[in-house]
Amino acid sequence: MDATRTFFGLPNVHNVPLCLTSNLSLFPQRLLQKHTLPLKPAKKHHLVCVRSTKSSDDLEGSRPSTYFSPSLWGDHFLSVSLDRGEFDELEREIETMKPLVKDMLMSSQSSDKEKIRLIHLLVSLGSSYHFDKEIQDILKHSFTKLDDIIVGEDDLETISIMFEVFRLYGHKMSCDAFDRFRGEDGRFKESLAKDVRGMLQLFEVAHLGTPSEDIMDEASSFAQNHLDSWIGGNVSGATPHLLKHIQNSLYIPRYCNIEVLVAREYISYYEQEEGHNKILLKFAKLNFNFCQFHYIQELKTLTKWWKDLDLASKLPYIRDRLVESHLGGLGPYFEPHYSLGRIIVAKIIMTMVVVDDTYDAHATVPEVAVLTECLQRLNIGADDKLPDYLRTVLESVFEVMGEIEQEMRPKGRSYGVKQVLERFKNVAKADKQLTEWARTGDVPSFDEYMKVGLVTAGMDGYAGYCFIGMEDVSEKEAFEWLSSNPLIIQALNVMFRLANDVGTYETEINRGEVANGLNCYMKQYGVTKEEASQELRKIYSNNKKVVMEEFMNSHDHVPRQVLLRCLNFARLFDVMYTEGDGYSEPKGKIEHFMTSLYVHPIPLS
C-alpha cells in the first residue's frame, strides 16, 4: 500500500492544501477560461453517497438510466467526394519539394544551431517525419558537442528551442542550461520579460520536465505569468498574430496538444510571420492537405463499416462516436503511412466503447457476470443464457477482432490481435468490479479504487491497438516490451484514469456511479471535491513528468517509434479532457478541432 501511495504521489492525509477554485478541470485554468468565462462563486462539494430503500437484489437487477447525445457526424463522410487527381497532384508536388527542403537541412553552410532551429520549424509545421533519419543523425552528432554549441549563448529562445528539439528526439539536454537566465537569488531574471518570443518558447519547453527538475515548474510559472499579462495589452514587438499564437499556447500548450493540431495552428501563424520561408510554408500546406486526404478516406471506410454493423441502432444506449474514435487514432500517429493503423485503432476503440457502455450504462449485475465470463472464454457457450442485446455485443467484439486478425495475417502481424484480446480480458474483470460498486452504491477507498481503475485504464491495450498497424516496428518485440509493464505505461494508466474520472465526474454522479476516483479520494481523505481535484491534478502532473523521463531514458533499448506513441498518448489526454469529457460530449472545442482536421483544407495561395 505504501509503495502504491508513493507511486501515485499521494499526499499525507492530514496535510491536504486547500484549493479555492470551483473549476474541476485537470489542467490549470487557461487563458480563455480566465478572460472570457465568468467564474461562479466557489461552492464546497462533499462526498456523494447513494442511499436506497431497495433491497440488494433490486439494486443488482436495476438498469442505469443513461443518455448520450447523438453523433455529430452521422454518415457525413460517405457523401464527401475525393478527387483522385488532386490527391496525385499533392503527392507529386510534395515529392518535388522534398529535395529542396532536405538540401536546407543538410547544407554544409548551416551551423549546428541553424540546423536545430530548422528542425524545430519542421516539427512545428508537421513536416519533420519526411526527414526523420536525417534529423536523428544530425542531432546525434550535435549532442556529442552540445557544451561547445551552447557556450556563451544568452538568447532565451535559442536555448529553449535546442532544449525542446533534443528532448523530443530522446537526448536529455540538461535543464542546467537555463541557469544562465537566473539571477543571484536563483529566480529567473525579470529582464527576460522583454523577450516575448523567448518567454513563449520557455513556457512551451517547461512542459518537457521530469520529476526531479523543479526549475521547469519555476520556468512554467514565470513564463505563464508574463504571457498572461500581455494578452489584451500592448506589448512592444508583439504583433496581433503573435498575441493570438500566445493565446492558443496558453489555452493548450504544444505538449498538451496532438502533433497535427499543433501543425494546423502553427502553419496559420507562420504564414503571417515576416520573412517566412515560402518553400517551407508551401511544403507544410501541401503536406497537411495530403494528410487530410488520408483522414477523409479513412473516415469514409470507417463510416461504411460502422453503418454496416448497425450497432448504433441495435444498441441505442452506446456512445456513437466513430469520428472521435478516429481522433483517438490520429493522436498517437498522424503520418500518412500509418493510415491502416488509424483504421484499426478506431475500429477497436469503437468496439471497446460498445463493451464499456454495456458495463457502465446498461447491463444489470447478473448480465455483467455473464458478459465477463463469455469475454474470458472469448466465445459464447451453448448454455449461456444471454439477452439478445448482450449476444449482439459479444458477437460484434468477436467479429471485429476476427476480421482484423484475418486482415493482418498475410502481413505476418496477427500476433498483436491475440495479445490485445488477452489484455482486454483483464479490463473486463475490472469493469465487472466497477459495475458492482456502481449498482450497489458502494464508495471504496481511493487506494482500493485505483487498484481496479488502473486496470480499466488499459493503456497497455491502447498501445497494443497502435502497434498492430505499425509495420515499421517488430510486432512481437513491441508486445514483449509491453508485457514487461514498463513504467511509462504505468504512468499513462494513472494519467488516463484521473483525467477520465475528473472529466466524467458530474455525468457519473448524476447516473449514480459513485465509485469515481474523485469521489473515492474525497472519502479516503475527508476532503471536499475542490481539494480532491487539486490533489488529483498534482498526481496527474507528476505522472506526466514520469512519462517524459521514461521517454528519454528508454531510447537506448526501445524503438523511437514505439516511445513516440506513448508520449503522444499523454498529449491526447490533454486534448480530450481540456473541457470535461471531450470524447463523450464533443460539442464545442473537440468539434472545432475535428472540423479543422477533417473538413477544411488549407488554402495553398
Curated annotation (Swiss-Prot):
Pfam families: Terpene_synth, Terpene_synth_C. GO terms for biological process: diterpenoid biosynthetic process. Mg(2+) 2 binds at D356, D360. Its cofactor is Mg(2+); Mn(2+). The keyword Cytoplasm applies. Belongs to the terpene synthase family. Tpsa subfamily. The Asp-Asp-Xaa-Xaa-Asp/Glu (DDXXD/E) motif is important for the catalytic activity, presumably through binding to Mg(2+). This is Terpenoid synthase 18.
